[in-house]
């Protein structure tokens, strides 16, 4: 095997392990967050005597449904592709990397990763905010608390929901900024690595050419002395 082929196989194995790690992380995250969303939908107890805003109930139902659908889609991709990658990675043969579908399914793996870690996490943050509003909004004022009765514009339930929203909204913005910064840093790192690998491949090719030329130069001399 030439140095160039050996370097290409090492690159393929590195991509295989990265794809496997992404699929494992996506499957664990999607299973956890979708399970939480389903439990929140089932266990939340709506007050039949309270008149909930129609928009709040529609937003909570839609957010929960989309959250579960997104994570189940990512989980389905991980479940379908991961066993094939695991079967190849457990074979102790360098040439078996060609049998792995990780390069052909690269877009699907990245889609599952994005759905699970970016879109799914943002929907989960929105789910927490809506759940706080649905849970705390029916709470009435405490007639025994004079401090609360003096402020007739807001109830304790509304105050709790507003507090959770005011905490979660800045955190969501920080999460978006961090996700964009992380993605740009990752793309920059991949670009640098690709340039480095191209330089290494060029050096390997030059070294292989030098060895071939040296072998061609030695062969006529050996034939002449023979």
Curated annotation (Swiss-Prot):
What GO biological process terms are annotated to this protein in UniProt?
Answer: adaptive immune response; positive regulation of calcium ion transport; store-operated calcium entry
Where in the cell is the protein located? Answer: Cell membrane
Q: Which domain of life is it from?
A: Eukaryota
Q: What is its main location?
A: membrane
Query: Pfam families attached here?
Result: Orai-1
Q: Which residues lie on this side of the membrane: Cytoplasmic?
A: 78-110, 181-226
Q: List the disulfide bonds.
A: none
Q: How does it sit in the membrane?
A: Multi-pass membrane protein
Q: Which UniProt keywords apply?
A: Adaptive immunity, Calcium, Calcium channel, Calcium transport, Cell membrane, Glycoprotein, Immunity, Ion channel, Ion transport, Membrane, Transmembrane, Transmembrane helix, Transport
Q: What does this protein do?
A: Ca(2+) release-activated Ca(2+) (CRAC) channel subunit which mediates Ca(2+) influx following depletion of intracellular Ca(2+) stores.
| Name recorded for this polypeptide | Calcium release-activated calcium channel protein 1
- What is the organism of origin for this protein? Gallus gallus
Query: What does the organism's lineage look like at the top?
Result: Eukaryota, Metazoa, Chordata, Craniata, Vertebrata
